[in-house]
């Protein structure tokens, strides 16, 4: 990773400029062009160094969310995971080595909508979701220290 990419990640991993043209503002701060910032972000994402650019919302204030899991027979896991991914309310899902082997996060406007989606998933898959709503959030600093240059 080159110096500009490191500086870009180090400076903006905890917040983007809140303005009409955030990438232009980032470019001005970093001393490069807006096109260069956008290209770096695309490259970092393609290389797997960056998973996404976007807000981190406090979902408990913006609506409702829950962590859910399904115990999926191994031979159905791929099909069920693909189906779960099609729900707009599903942020992401992942496989685990456990009886409950497919985990996913659901977000919705309110708890009633979450319950409807969980019921739909149960009807759709024939599997009963384990619903694990958050009780309390313990926030941690997710920033990673990055050297300016090597």
UniProtKB/Swiss-Prot annotation:
Keywords: Lyase. Pathway: Porphyrin-containing compound metabolism. It comes from the Bacteria. Disruption phenotype: The nirDLGH mutant lacks dissimilatory nitrite reductase (NIR) activity. The NIR activity is restored by adding purified heme d1. Pfam families: AsnC_trans_reg2 (PF17805), NirdL-like_HTH (PF22451). The keyword Mitochondrion does not apply. It catalyses: siroheme + 2 H(+) = 12,18-didecarboxysiroheme + 2 CO2. It is an enzyme of class 4 (lyase). GO terms for molecular function: lyase activity. Its EC number is 4.1.1.111. Involved in heme d1 biosynthesis. Catalyzes the decarboxylation of siroheme into didecarboxysiroheme. Belongs to the Ahb/Nir family. Probably forms a complex composed of NirD, NirL, NirG and NirH. All proteins are required for the total conversion of siroheme to didecarboxysiroheme. This is Siroheme decarboxylase NirD subunit. It comes from Pseudomonas aeruginosa (strain ATCC 15692 / DSM 22644 / CIP 104116 / JCM 14847 / LMG 12228 / 1C / PRS 101 / PAO1). The lineage of its organism: Bacteria, Pseudomonadati, Pseudomonadota, Gammaproteobacteria, Pseudomonadales.
